[in-house]
Regions:
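C-terminal peripheral helix-coil segments that are non-catalytic and often amphipathic
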Residues: 156-190
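Regular secondary-structure segments
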Residues: 13-17, 60, 64, 86, ...
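Amphipathic alpha-helical packing segments from all-alpha helical-bundle domains
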Residues: 102-128, 134-152, 179
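Amphipathic alpha-helical segments that line or abut small-molecule/effector binding pockets
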Residues: 72-90, 141, 145, 149, ...
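Secondary-structure edge/capping motif, primarily at the C-terminal ends of alpha-helices
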Residues: 66-67, 89-99, 120-127, 154-158, ...
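Residue at a beta-strand N-cap/secondary-structure junction
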Residues: 21-24, 160
Length: 190
């Protein structure tokens, strides 16, 4: 029953967010639309925000796909994220233009950083090299800030560009793969 209730909540929320502003939605609205009790909602989630970020994490994880997270390029993974945002354009815009905006930007920041760290870990495991913690933090922060800024600007300006065009622009701008960047920042390169 728990998985069914959660699925009903998520489906109802997504449908409601496509029609109404996030700030106008309540747990009562979502529970009524899902035809599940509020008590059931609170059994699974502490708050509406907790629920929203669970929905977002699931949607992005599905778009990114756990297997492709480590094997694809970082840009390709990012393109899948912005494609998922564009596929849910109304819902994404409603969340971004709500009282949840700051938390949403923080969520994307953390989500993107986790993906970058996973990919760095996979690359360092496949091709071992020594890097200082400072170098790892610097590379992670630069990629995170770039991707977060692009994503935030993309949402803010209405998600008009094709995600693949953004990916091509990133590749042209960066000019090399994450693996090459890690090699350049490795202790062996010094």
């Amino acid at each position: 029953m728990a998985k069914k209730a959660i699925k009903k909540f998520k489906t109802a929320f997504t449908e409601l967010l496509g029609k109404y502003s996030y700030d106008d939605l309540t747990i009562v609205n979502v529970s009524d639309a899902a035809k599940v009790t509020r008590q059931s909602f609170y059994y699974h989630y502490e708050s509406m925000e907790d629920f929203v970020f669970d929905v977002l994490r699931d949607e992005l994880d599905e778009a990114v796909n756990k297997e492709r997270r480590k094997s694809g390029t970082l840009t390709a993974t990012f393109v899948r994220i912005i494609s998922a945002c564009r596929a849910s354009k109304t819902e994404t815009s409603n969340l971004y233009n709500s009282s949840l905006k700051e938390e949403l930007v923080d969520f994307f920041n953390n989500y993107i950083e986790d993906l970058i760290r996973e990919q760095i870990g996979a690359l360092l495991q496949a091709s071992p090299r020594t890097m200082s913690e400072e170098a790892l933090q610097f590379v992670t922060a630069q990629y995170r800030n770039m991707f977060r800024s692009i994503l935030e600007d993309y949402i803010r300006t209405g998600m008009k560009e094709k995600p693949t065009d953004i990916g091509k622009g990133i590749d042209r701008f960066v000019g090399r793969s994450l693996d090459q960047v890690l090699t350049d920042f490795s202790d062996e390169a010094e």
